[in-house]
Amino acid sequence: MPKEDIHPTWYPDAKVICNGEVVMTTGSTQPEIHVDVWSGNHPFFTGTQKILDTEGRVDRFMRKYGMADSENDSTDKKKTTNEKKVSDSPSKES
């Protein structure tokens, strides 16, 4: 005999919510589904191009790959530490 009550609750009219608006209904195991992008505002379907900066991902990319404004500052610091190491090292004198 199969076990009873092992399946999650099914909501045939689950609401899909984007930016506070109900954009569609579907069947799901959750009563509400919150999304950032759906076909009504996705750049591919609307023909527009925009950057979706969710949680600062663009800024993180810029920092990670050295495209931020502080790139020159960090390279200057590296140069000064390397110069210091060279000047502090003992010289070989015979």
Swiss-Prot record:
Entries under Gene3D superfamilies matching the protein: Ribosomal protein L31
Domain of life according to the entry: Bacteria
Q: Sorted alphabetically, which InterPro entries does this protein's record hold? A: Ribosomal_bL28/bL31-like_sf (IPR034704), Ribosomal_bL31 (IPR002150), Ribosomal_bL31_A (IPR027491), Ribosomal_bL31_sf (IPR042105)
Organism, by scientific name, is: Prochlorococcus marinus (strain MIT 9211)
- Any idea what job this protein has? Binds the 23S rRNA.
Q: Where in the sequence does UniProt note compositional bias of the Basic and acidic residues kind?
A: 74-94
Give the span(s) annotated as Disordered: 65-94
- What is this protein called in UniProt? Large ribosomal subunit protein bL31
